[in-house]
């Protein structure tokens, strides 16, 4: 009898519409778009340009040492120096040699800083550029040695020097040998200064730890890119130590400018022109 027949039901997947919607979404290659960490806008990579600056809020994306070199130095003027120096893994830190090898292969760099000489609008200078894609540009024995040799070379050749900083601090895998580079580089900076030579530091995002507490803060003129994170200890560590809530803009370049730790904040698009002008003024003073 039809009255007692078992009813039949068709099961519908409640997530079907979501699954179909996801399936309909086109795959967009990551290299085509970037999301701005500041304003959260999705930006077409070509709109960022070679300076990698957000067109919506002027946020400065982090860039590699090679990208930095391309927008600052005159074309084909950079002569790299002090390559081939390698860490001996003084603490026998497990996995450290393998990590170094993998990072070198991925970045095409031999360490976290590029050192050499270049011209900027025709003005010759010694130049060092740190690269945060290389183990967060942490300062180990090789970084310290390359920077020290560059300062010594600049002192001998009577050259000004420009250093672009970007670092997470000392390299923990090298322990006290890493911390020693703070004193070593600072001494080299002092000898360069005693010779009456010109030193510019450009603080970029992020510049922290032992790098901030040594050569990064010793420039005759200290410039910074907008909104760069600059400090020694981390925000959370400081708040837990002093038991106070820090201002929202604490450790930002603008905060440091207002408190006298930075001489000027320069937009990335204007940095090449500003550096060339400073080098030119320094040269003119020398010739007086």
From Swiss-Prot:
Reported function: Component of the acetyl coenzyme A carboxylase (ACC) complex. Biotin carboxylase (BC) catalyzes the carboxylation of biotin on its carrier protein (BCCP) and then the CO(2) group is transferred by the transcarboxylase to acetyl-CoA to form malonyl-CoA.
Return the cofactor note field: Binds 1 zinc ion per subunit.
Primary localization class, coarse:
cytoplasm
Where does each C4-type zinc finger lie?
36-57
Query: What is the annotated localization of this protein?
Result: Cytoplasm
Quote the protein name from its UniProt record: Acetyl-coenzyme A carboxylase carboxyl transferase subunit beta
Which pathway does this chain act in?
Lipid metabolism; malonyl-CoA biosynthesis; malonyl-CoA from acetyl-CoA: step 1/1
Reaction equations catalysed: N(6)-carboxybiotinyl-L-lysyl-[protein] + acetyl-CoA = N(6)-biotinyl-L-lysyl-[protein] + malonyl-CoA
Report the gene name: accD
Q: Does the keyword Mitochondrion apply?
A: no
Q: Name one GO molecular function term.
A: carboxyl- or carbamoyltransferase activity
User: Binding of Zn(2+): at which residues?
Assistant: 36, 39, 54, 57
Q: Which residues form the CoA carboxyltransferase N-terminal domain?
A: 32-288
| Taxonomy, superkingdom | Bacteria
Q: Which keywords has UniProt assigned to this entry?
A: ATP-binding, Cytoplasm, Fatty acid biosynthesis, Fatty acid metabolism, Lipid biosynthesis, Lipid metabolism, Metal-binding, Nucleotide-binding, Transferase, Zinc, Zinc-finger
Record's subunit section:
Acetyl-CoA carboxylase is a heterohexamer composed of biotin carboxyl carrier protein (AccB), biotin carboxylase (AccC) and two subunits each of ACCase subunit alpha (AccA) and ACCase subunit beta (AccD).
| E.C. number(s) listed in UniProt | 2.1.3.15
Taken from the UniProt entry, a GO cellular component term is: acetyl-CoA carboxylase complex
Which cofactors does this gene product need? Zn(2+)
Q: List the disulfide bonds.
A: none
Which family does the record assign?
Belongs to the AccD/PCCB family.
A Pfam family assignment = Zn_ribbon_ACC
